[in-house]
């Protein structure tokens, strides 16, 4: 694989969150590098985002699928089967990507050839004190050991599914995500880490969820 030009597949499971999908897709139209496709998988939603996806088809290489509700792991596996990329990047629907996110991924893959990678999310300076406190409790090494994917680490690095990438051949060798509805990302990450495949933190800051923090933000990479 040519790491400089590897095609990336962004896999995004969605459940009843069309507004978040619109913000995420809008951030993807602003990427400085465009060697990616977007695979949206609607996980049995009653409030679908199909109309949102259709509005972006002239701006992005984006596909939409609707499947019966089976949980995020099942939706990610379905999306992976539809994908064409050399690498899969798994995102939550509430992410907002900084303009150089894809550029940063390409740079890290070219330099390291990592099998798996990931990065943190972070609160914006404009967040309220309560929103910042929630973010700190979920990302600080003092509270969780950096469980949500901080760049530095106290122990082994386990990318999390809100901002996680993996070589597609590695994903296939592992058999995909578990159908369990919670913790499937950590269970998925355990085998490659134990087998010493290269998994590394990548400095890729994301915007914060409207649903979780009450305000969507765009953050530059490296925060």
Placement of each model-derived feature along the sequence:
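Acidic donor-binding segment of Leloir-type glycosyltransferases
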Residues: 25-66
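Glycine-rich, basic loop-to-helix element that forms the pyrophosphate-binding segment
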Residues: 67-83, 104, 158-162
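Cell-envelope/extracellular polymer assembly enzymes that use nucleotide-activated donors
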Residues: 6-9, 37, 187
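A recurrent flexible, glycine/aromatic-enriched loop bordering the glycosyltransferase active site
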Residues: 123, 144-165, 169, 180-182, ...
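Conserved donor NDP-sugar-binding/catalytic core segment of glycosyltransferases
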Residues: 100-132, 136, 195, 200-205
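Catalytic donor/gating beta->alpha subdomain of glycosyltransferases that bind UDP-sugars
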Residues: 178-223
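Short aromatic/hydrophobic "clamp" motif used to bind/position activated sugar donors
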Residues: 88
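N-proximal low-complexity "stem/linker" segments adjacent to membrane-targeting elements
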Residues: 1-30
């Amino acid at each position: 694989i040519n790491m400089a030009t590897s095609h990336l597949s962004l896999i995004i499971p969605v459940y009843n969150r069309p507004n978040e999908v619109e913000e995420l897709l809008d951030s993807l139209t602003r990427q400085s590098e465009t060697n990616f496709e977007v695979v949206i998988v609607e996980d049995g939603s009653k409030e679908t985002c199909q109309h949102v996806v259709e509005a972006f088809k002239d701006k992005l290489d984006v596909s939409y699928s609707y499947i019966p509700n089976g949980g995020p792991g099942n939706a990610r596996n379905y999306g992976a089967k539809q994908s064409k990329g050399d690498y899969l990047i798994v995102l939550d629907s509430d992410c907002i990507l900084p303009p150089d996110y894809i550029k940063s991924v390409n740079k890290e893959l070219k330099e390291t050839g990592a099998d798996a990678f990931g990065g943190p999310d972070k609160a914006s300076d404009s967040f309220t004190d309560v929103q910042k406190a929630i973010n700190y409790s979920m990302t600080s090494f003092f509270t969780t050991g950096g469980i949500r994917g901080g760049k530095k680490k106290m122990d082994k690095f386990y990318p999390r599914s809100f901002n996680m990438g993996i070589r597609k051949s590695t994903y296939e060798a592992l058999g995909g995500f578990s159908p369990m509805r919670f913790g499937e990302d950590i269970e998925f990450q355990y085998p490659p880490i134990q087998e010493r495949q290269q998994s590394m933190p990548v400095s890729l800051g994301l915007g914060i969820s409207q649903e979780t923090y009450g305000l969507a933000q765009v953050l530059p990479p490296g925060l």
